Amino acid sequence: MQNSNKILQALGIPYTALLSVIFGLLLVSFPIGIFVVFESDVGGDINFDYPLTHLELFHGTELYLMPTDISIGDAFVVLWTFYAILFTISAIGPKHGFFKSLSSVISFGKSEYQSNYMVGITKWLSILILISVLINFIQEGFGIETIPPLDDNDLIQFFYVSLAPLIEEFGFRLLLIGIPLFALYSSKSSPKYFLRCLWRPANLDIFDSKKAILLIVFVGVLFGFAHIAFGDSWSEGKFAQASAGGIILGWVYLRYGFVASLLVHWATNYFVFSYATFISQINF
């Protein structure tokens, strides 16, 4: 038992180092995102003053092309602030800070995954990225390409990838997983308890996880299909990648709650795009 604990402690050193590096990169991505939107020329002939209602997002509604003082930069700052607040909350709680939680892995060879949200976020973000890369590598070997939807402007695309996690996590995790889980496993019916379980399904007494796992897999596949189902969507190669990502996000939601799944999703979008755009601007 003692030898086993020493092995876990030894493995804990590279493990905590990896999570610490990812945490640092996520932290730095916040100012990088601000630079990309407000200081770079990624938008070409438009910039952060572009009216929000001119986005194709509002096409077909009464808001489309309506005169407004709200710009894409204003909306981005609201999203940025929202994610920054959640990031801070995740780094300091719910019980211990990020680095204090990691220190227990090195000191005692064990990790209490519920002590800090950021530990779970960085761990599952690593897993999600690794699986996505593997799927992409395998599919390319069979000639299956993963082509993103075409957008004429990178600034608008950056705004969309920042907004998408909030919309998709609300729809696919809160509504399609959270509510059915409550219906399956809840022993109470109070509104307060419902909201607590929706926010963090671990509050439910999930005595038989088979139904929960099947639900997560089903919604994950649905999530993958949603990425290729429309005319301006990703190519078919995105289906497997998005389905795997949807299943992982569903598991993160079940185990850690909505904040964790939202931030993992945000990181895969905002984090990757901000660094890629920043590097391209430097090279340019």
Task: Enumerate the language-model features and the residues they cover.
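Hydrophobic transmembrane alpha-helices
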Residues: 13-20, 122-123, 233-237, 241-242
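Alpha-helical transmembrane segments and their membrane-interface junctions
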Residues: 34, 125-147, 217-235
